[in-house]
């Protein structure tokens, strides 16, 4: 993962050239912070929905078509990546004492 940057919040999207994007962590009510909070909530909701879909696919006796399985696994990988980034961002804020959750 990325190294913690003092006073900055890791955002749930990439910056230029695919590098981590940060914003100052001194205004949790600012526009960028609120947008990041909303995006993190949406990412976590999507991850939960994908997990439920995967569980349903595993619960049936007949295996799903390979293309359907591949699609769900790819989306699960995306969701896990997003979830890990949210966890990293929140962990960084906890260690600096600026966490809002």
Residue ranges and their predicted role:
Residues 1-101:
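Hydrophobic alpha-helical segments that drive targeting, anchoring, or assembly
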């Amino acid at each position: 993962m990325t190294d913690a940057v003092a006073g900055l919040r890791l955002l749930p999207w990439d910056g230029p050239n695919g590098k981590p994007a940060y914003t100052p962590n001194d205004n949790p009510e600012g526009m960028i912070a609120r947008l990041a909070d909303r995006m993190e909530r949406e990412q976590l909701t999507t991850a939960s929905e994908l997990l439920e879909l995967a569980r349903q696919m595993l619960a049936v006796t007949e295996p799903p078509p390979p293309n359907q399985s591949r699609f769900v696994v790819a989306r699960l990988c995306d969701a896990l990546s997003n979830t890990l980034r949210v966890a990293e961002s929140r962990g960084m804020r906890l260690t600096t004492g600026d966490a809002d959750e």
